[in-house]
């Protein structure tokens, strides 16, 4: 090597790990109306100060990397960087903190939940300085909300399409979820809808298996709901699961559902992905289909208390991506869910404006401007004796979905549906008359059972 090109190790650029808090911890920062705000539950590694941990989250989820790079000088770091602007301890937890991070709106592609999540949670959860990290909440500014279509139709349009007002809607997941032939599956759909339910549903893992291909299921379910409609005079629906291995196949199934004239299709939005879900939501709006969303895989992401993403964030993401219904727990059934926390994200799904309320887990005031609302679906281990509590907790703008609570009736599927419809009508009437569902719920069901042998069974 010539003297002119020889390089010694002691000469030239020296890379080194920098302290993130020098650049990304800015406690004096005043948040802007256009910032996306995030609340992270941070558990730093021993010896890592909370300010450094919070700054690391802000850096790694925005413009930062582990060292200074030459190209930092080619952009306006101050304009584009995320900022950790506040840190507070978690009550009762010595080593956990809530780190509040503000992100400039220009960091995100318009109308893309995929890009938003890739930026905010895509890489930082594996960061060495953190023992655990959980995204507790996001504040989506109106300027970003307005770049999304959101739910294909929303609550009021759905009620108008179905001509159903003044009560929760009733549904049922067909069981067993796997193994039925398409014809027997359609028979169960007919019996439930004929008995008085508004909807029946494919389970989340019913796609197109050898025992029941999707096209056969769609045809027999459409036949069942048209027959039930003709006999009851009510508009009925079955959530036809369009989830598939490719977006092209998913779209093909949605097109076939539209050609059959059914009112609603379904998608597993977490396993299917946000890009696929948003594409399907756009198709549903353009073609008059309602879209039911199942949250399969959510507990992998949201169940741990100190690591992952809280469901309220996933619920907000769904409202942006698009869906007319989404499963939201039950409070009283077989699946985990606290009442105050559940009511918090139910309001975030339905309401136009939700104020900050830490007692319900809402870290930021959220203004959805004109984005349509989403109906929460209560599903999982519920039956007629839960009806008073469900009616009180979820109110009219909800779907109460009973699987085993319908199909497990000793007299069969149709009597199970009758029992659910009678129980719901009794609870709604009692509530409208001023009775206390929480205190008198069991008495209301017992009184109704005197006039309904199906409910008394």
Swiss-Prot record:
Per UniProt, Mg(2+) binds at: 201, 203-204
Q: Which residues form the propeptide?
A: 1-2
N-acetylproline-modified residues are where?
A: 3
Location in or out of the cell = Plastid, Chloroplast
Which Enzyme Commission numbers does its entry carry?
4.1.1.39
> PTM details?
The disulfide bond which can form in the large chain dimeric partners within the hexadecamer appears to be associated with oxidative stress and protein turnover.
Comment on bound cofactor: Binds 1 Mg(2+) ion per subunit.
Q: Which residues form a coiled coil?
A: none
Report what the protein is called. Answer: Ribulose bisphosphate carboxylase large chain
